[in-house]
């Protein structure tokens, strides 16, 4: 059985174009393993749009996010931190999942 991950629809085009190559998640989604292939769907309607391969899963604190992380998310560092705070309010311990579209 294939494992799945969802993304907000606003990220779909960046993932498909290879502009978004990481996702930052909380501990509940830190269990993915390098080499694992995931089905990717939109969070809002659960419509499948591609597969990704997990390359790495690395812990990071909110204040440890860098311009490099922001580039991999296809946004500025300020935008990235704001999005993370909206999705995970009050959470500081996160995980960077690096992936490649298949």
Curated annotation (Swiss-Prot):
SMART domains recorded: ASCH
Key word Hydrolase present: yes
ASCH domain: residues covered: 6-93
Enzyme class: hydrolase
InterPro entries referenced in this protein's UniProt entry, alphabetically: AC4CH, ASCH_domain, PUA-like_sf
One GO MF term: hydrolase activity, acting on carbon-nitrogen (but not peptide) bonds, in linear amidines
Record has Phosphoprotein as a keyword: no
Residue numbers annotated as active site: 20 (proton acceptor), 23 (nucleophile), 73 (proton donor)
Keywords of the record: Hydrolase
GO terms for cellular component: cytosol
Enzyme Commission code(s) on record: 3.5.1.135
Reactions catalysed according to its record: N(4)-acetylcytidine + H2O = cytidine + acetate + H(+); N(4)-acetyl-2'-deoxycytidine + H2O = 2'-deoxycytidine + acetate + H(+); N(4)-acetylcytosine + H2O = cytosine + acetate + H(+)
Protein family per UniProt: Belongs to the N(4)-acetylcytidine amidohydrolase family.
Role of this protein: Catalyzes the hydrolysis of N(4)-acetylcytidine (ac4C).
PANTHER family per the UniProt record, alphabetical: UCP029143 FAMILY PROTEIN
Protein name: N(4)-acetylcytidine amidohydrolase
Native source species: Serratia proteamaculans (strain 568)
